[in-house]
């Protein structure tokens, strides 16, 4: 769920508050439209697509609880998660790891969505 995703982000990117990722680019934090503006925004587009795929499986990705572990910046989804929990955990894990590897460009935070995301 979104609370667990926030905690996963904190695991992989402890130096930056989670909410910095909630209004970034064209895909981080809102529906998503247009071409991703950078690598971090592309991480969010992939995450959105992953949630969409989980939804098509009959899952509720924003609310599905799952089990995972964070150890020294490394995330692991619990192998005993059910079908939906496993799918959503994997979406969040991949995104949190992607965030950790992508540069954060301050100018791409809180952009003019209507102008830049067509």
From Swiss-Prot:
UniProt GO molecular function: calcium ion binding; calcium-dependent phospholipase A2 activity; phospholipid binding; toxin activity
Similarity annotation: Belongs to the phospholipase A2 family. Group I subfamily. D49 sub-subfamily.
Name this polypeptide is given: Basic phospholipase A2 nigexine
GO cellular component: extracellular region
Localization of this protein: Secreted
Task performed by this protein: Snake venom phospholipase A2 (PLA2) that shows anticoagulant activity, has cytotoxic activity and affects neuromuscular transmission in vitro. PLA2 catalyzes the calcium-dependent hydrolysis of the 2-acyl groups in 3-sn-phosphoglycerides.
Listed GO biological process terms: arachidonate secretion; lipid catabolic process; phospholipid metabolic process
Species: Naja pallida
Enzyme Commission identifier(s): 3.1.1.4
Residues at the active site: 47, 92
Motif (Coagulation factor Xa binding motif): 52-69
Chief place of localization: secreted
Keywords: Blood coagulation cascade inhibiting toxin, Calcium, Disulfide bond, Hemostasis impairing toxin, Hydrolase, Lipid degradation, Lipid metabolism, Metal-binding, Neurotoxin, Secreted, Toxin
Classification of source organism: Eukaryota, Metazoa, Chordata, Craniata, Vertebrata
Note on how the cofactor is bound: Binds 1 Ca(2+) ion.
Residues that, per the record, bind Ca(2+): 27, 29, 31, 48
Tissues where this protein is expressed: Expressed by the venom gland.
